[in-house]
Amino acid sequence: MTRLLSAHRKVVADQGRLLEALESALGELVRSSPSRTDCSSLEAEQCAVGCFAMDPLVAAEGEVLLCLDPADLEQERFSYLLECLHGAFLRGVTIRCICAESMINLPGGRSYIQELQTAGAEIRVAPLLPFRLMLVDRIFACVSVVDRHGENSTLEIRSPETCHFVHRVFDYCWVTRTSSKACETADAIDVSDREVIILRLLANGMKDVAMARSLGISTRTLRRVITDLMGKLGVSSRFQLGARAAECRLLWSVLS
């Protein structure tokens, strides 16, 4: 399990470097774009704007892609987003959304995910986002990035080529960097505090004898609990148990 966590950290670090490169490139694109007070003209292929425009969601016909983080959870904005997404879903629009894992860590974070699902969005969760994004029908995009100078900028894009590039980045993250099970937590899986502690001790590489001693139980009882845990999480090995526990965020759940 220790090797699994080390490998996971390396993947996250590699992804972080990739995202830094993407954000830097898009940040340069933002700075080189003309700043306009009116970006509604179809001739403007890209321009820097103050914030995401929701109006294109109302006109969505085929597909909406979103990358959301806690900045998108401002109450009035989020409520309007849900309203637009639900309307699009009723029109038959496909909606896919990658949510930053940090959203789940917020108080009531899982309820935000559930509201998005109720509105018709298919949800996946990622440790890191390439950028905040709204892409509508592959012809209009809003991308928000933090450039290498730490400045947050939003770019409105109407260029078909750039929208295609953004779509490819989203698809890559959707397939390779996200989990559809990451919204599950100890609340959704019936585990006790003692079982969560055992999972954490396993993740730290502690031997059975040492774990049993620290918990004040016999090694036989410990192994029975681990076997029961494997059954609950639907796995057949301790390695799979560690992977599934991390996937369901059991290693970081709050004990009662």
From Swiss-Prot:
Single GO MF descriptor: DNA binding
Gene: brpA
Physiological role: Involved in the regulation of the biosynthesis of phosphinothricin tripeptide (PTT), also known as bialaphos (BA), a natural-product antibiotic and potent herbicide.
GO terms classed as biological process: antibiotic biosynthetic process; regulation of DNA-templated transcription
All copies of domain HTH luxR-type, residue ranges: 184-249
Keywords noted in UniProt: Antibiotic biosynthesis, DNA-binding, Transcription, Transcription regulation
Pfam families per record: GerE
Name of protein: Bialaphos biosynthetic pathway regulatory protein
Top-level taxon of origin: Bacteria
PROSITE patterns named in the record: HTH_LUXR_2
PANTHER family per UniProt: TRANSCRIPTIONAL REGULATORY PROTEIN NARL-RELATED, TWO-COMPONENT RESPONSE REGULATOR
Signal sequence annotation: none
DNA-binding region: 208-227
Transmembrane regions: none
Coiled coil: none
